[in-house]
């Protein structure tokens, strides 16, 4: 579904406005989203097989935080709220003052992006849809796994710390570093992820895990 020229111009203006509005989030993100130091003594010592089993069983969560995307000539910064139930999800991407907001809802084979209650678009993958409508994308299909600190299905190379936390991962052309974990209940979950793929660099901060 293509937009008429007036809508394209309005979309470009909105994208320009969000870049300005969200620059404040980029500046404040280093402070308001700075994570407290956590003693490694609270971490759970497990074998990788045990840790992978526990993390792979998590299929429902509510998380929020912020992310930044840096690519040649463009920097995107936004906050997000991510609700996951099984393979179905809803993600709201918004500015700190809600000047700009989009909603992405998906299930296997069908993803919808909502700009407003009457303006929505669909695609078969979230990456395709975000690139078409936002001009940038996050690897959401794989982040379903990476956000829990486990590899997605398929070939990968990984490094672990002494607690068997995944700290570095190469998969599907991406290099992922897990620079901080937090203990939630009986499991340790990522707080900060740094992803790179060629000239594209992404940082994701999880502020709250539920």
From Swiss-Prot:
Per the record, the similarity remark reads: Belongs to the LolB family.
The protein's UniProt keywords, in alphabetical order, are: Cell outer membrane, Chaperone, Lipoprotein, Membrane, Palmitate, Protein transport, Signal, Transport
Keyword check for Chaperone, yes or no. Answer: yes
Residues lipid-modified (N-palmitoyl cysteine): 30
Span-the-membrane segments of this chain are none
Q: Where in the cell is it found?
A: Cell outer membrane
What Pfam families does its record include?
LolB (PF03550)
**How is the subunit organization of this protein annotated in UniProt?**
Monomer.
GO cellular component term, pick one: cell outer membrane
Record gene name? lolB
Coiled coil (residue ranges): none
Spell out where lipidation (S-diacylglycerol cysteine) occurs: 30
Task: Output the GO biological process annotations, alphabetical, semicolon-separated.
Answer: lipoprotein localization to outer membrane; protein transport
Q: How does it sit in the membrane?
A: Lipid-anchor
NCBIfam families, per database record: lolB
Spell out the disulfide connections. Answer: none
The scientific name of the source species is Coxiella burnetii (strain Dugway 5J108-111)
Protein function: Plays a critical role in the incorporation of lipoproteins in the outer membrane after they are released by the LolA protein.
Q: What is this protein called?
A: Outer-membrane lipoprotein LolB
According to the UniProt entry, where is the signal peptide?
1-29
| Keyword Transport tagged | yes
